[in-house]
Amino acid sequence: MTIKHDDWLLEQLKDAEFAAEFLNAANEDDDPKTYLTALRKVVEARGGMALVAEKAHLSRETLYRTLSSARGNPTIKTLNAVLKATGLKFGVSAQ
């Protein structure tokens, strides 16, 4: 049986540890667009835009705009809310 990459990825991202590592890897790229694209995938896998927006106390439109790789420039407060809504949190480590 063949499975599409996106389907496989979305299934894997349902696991919190995998999702955290996925976001950490995306954060290694110096381009914030990479992180926003990865976070968008995590949101999709862990409930979808509507549910995550509701849990984060954001409108769906605001969440879409926030995670837009073209225009997105989320605040720390918004990123924290989105991560919390997906069951994740920020972390910092030494280089």
Would you name each region that the model predicts?
Residues 57, 81, 95:
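Long, contiguous binding/interaction regions
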